[in-house]
Amino acid sequence: MTDTAENQTQNNWQAEHPRSIRSFVLRQSHMTAAQQRAIDTLWGSFGIDYQATPADLDARFGSSRPKILEIGFGMGTATAEIARRLPETDFLAIDVHGPGVGNLLKLIEENHLENIRVMRHDAVEVVENMLQDGSLDGIHIFFPDPWHKKRHHKRRLIQAPFIAKLLPKLKTGGYIHLATDWEEYAQQMLEVLSSFDSLQNTAADYAPTPDYRPETKFEARGKRLGHGVWDLVFKRIG
């Protein structure tokens, strides 16, 4: 997909879904030649096209390893590193940002990673239509847009209705791991997850950063600006 075609696709999506609640913000962006080449040559091996019917993840990965859903991977650097650290776990990574998709595919090739599959679609629709109940061992959502202004808080991804959609997809014993560098959003995340009887916090409030999660470029920048970082890890118990 060329950069022009990408922008046209985004415009068409907005026209067809004028009032949809989405997991992302469409934005104009430039894809490098290397990112475009990665999409052109690697999508057939590591990309999964959206379908409005349940998918067999074991078949798509060619393995029965544990499955982790990652929503919003940015440029994919942290995703690739997590997959490298956890080679016996499969990662379904979803984002709509073309350059990020291309970059993650490039990282998959460079690092010889076989345990990542990439989707370029709205994660809400993927969760609603493609993921079977009890198909996930974990869910990662790292640094979602905090929508700082109060009037925009309704656009935040981490709200009770979306968590309610995610929960059936998790196996009992599976986990949700969230991270943010916006304290007020961290408080909201804690309140939302704590409101579900079927979720149990693995810490008193905020969790230590698990060993598998590397520091992201976004996170490092925030720390330089004096921001804190909050991780939350909740386990499904019923």
UniProtKB/Swiss-Prot annotation:
Pfam families linked: Methyltransf_4 (PF02390)
UniProt xrefs under InterPro entries: SAM-dependent_MTases_sf, tRNA_(Gua-N-7)_MeTrfase_Trmb, tRNA_methyltr_TrmB_bact
Keyword terms of this UniProt record: Methyltransferase, S-adenosyl-L-methionine, Transferase, tRNA processing
Residues given in the record as S-adenosyl-L-methionine binding sites: E70, D95, D122, D145
GO function terms (MF aspect): tRNA (guanine(46)-N7)-methyltransferase activity
Family recorded in the similarity comment: Belongs to the class I-like SAM-binding methyltransferase superfamily. TrmB family.
Reaction(s) catalysed (UniProt annotation): guanosine(46) in tRNA + S-adenosyl-L-methionine = N(7)-methylguanosine(46) in tRNA + S-adenosyl-L-homocysteine
EC number per UniProt: 2.1.1.33
Origin species: Neisseria meningitidis serogroup A / serotype 4A (strain DSM 15465 / Z2491)
Record-level GO cellular component terms: tRNA methyltransferase complex
Protein name: tRNA (guanine-N(7)-)-methyltransferase
Residues that, per the record, bind substrate: K149, D181, T216, K217, F218, E219
Function: Catalyzes the formation of N(7)-methylguanine at position 46 (m7G46) in tRNA.
Active-site residues annotated for this sequence: D145
Annotated pathway: tRNA modification; N(7)-methylguanine-tRNA biosynthesis
Enzyme's top EC category: transferase
Coiled coil: none
